[in-house]
Amino acid sequence: MVSIRLDGGERRKGIVEAALPLFARKGFARTTTREIAEAAQVSEALLFKHFATKVALYEEILRFGCRDVDPALERLQALEASTATLVHMTHFMVRHVATGLLSDPAEQDTKHRLMVNSFLEDGEFARIVFDNIFAWVYPKFAACIAAAEAAGELRTSPIAPENCFWLGQHVAAMLAYVRLPRGAAGPYRGAIDEVATQAVWFILRGIGLSDAAIARHSEPGALAATWPGMTPEPRAALVAMAR
């Protein structure tokens, strides 16, 4: 067998990538350095050469998980603040988080499991992810809320915009979390794509957007133009929800 010699940076990245699914499945406290070394195909001595402690490795995972910016978030920055963008970004957020739209299924599953385990431990991974999401997405969301209200398509709400943002995100996230077990734990009626579309309406209605605006800006063609690869419910289903 030919041994491939990796430089320090590549070796560290390999160890992090090997540790990610372990932390996702078992959590930080229950994952041993021996398991990490075996998964990374290195000795524990080499593991400790790159990461002095398991905590140091976990901290690197926190940085690694937020290092790359999702291309979809960069695309979002270029969109004009409007009612249409508010509807489109909500459709994408729910589909991306809850069904894995435009993402690698294995990576998405790992991220969700890391989040759930983080809630049960120190919460640090979840805090960093949420801070990252807020920094990238909330400014556009808030601008869209203001634009929709100015256009007369959004009624004034007693709910703080920040809470509207997080409550919507948490609806989408919980749809994903209840599907983590082999047999989905959420007793929803209908297929996941149908439930995701209903979740979009639930969120947008809660924000205060009118049914007419939701239906108008949920046209399949417009959504696909903004987010290539998105195939939402047929227009007939959207119209039925607006009645």
Model-derived regions, located:
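C-terminal peripheral helix-coil segments that are non-catalytic and often amphipathic
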Residues: 2, 92-103, 135-151, 155, ...
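Conserved hydrophobic residue
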Residues: 28-29, 124, 154
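Short helix-capping/turn signature of helix-turn-helix
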Residues: 51, 116-123
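Hydrophobic alpha-helical connector segments
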Residues: 60, 74-111, 161-165, 196
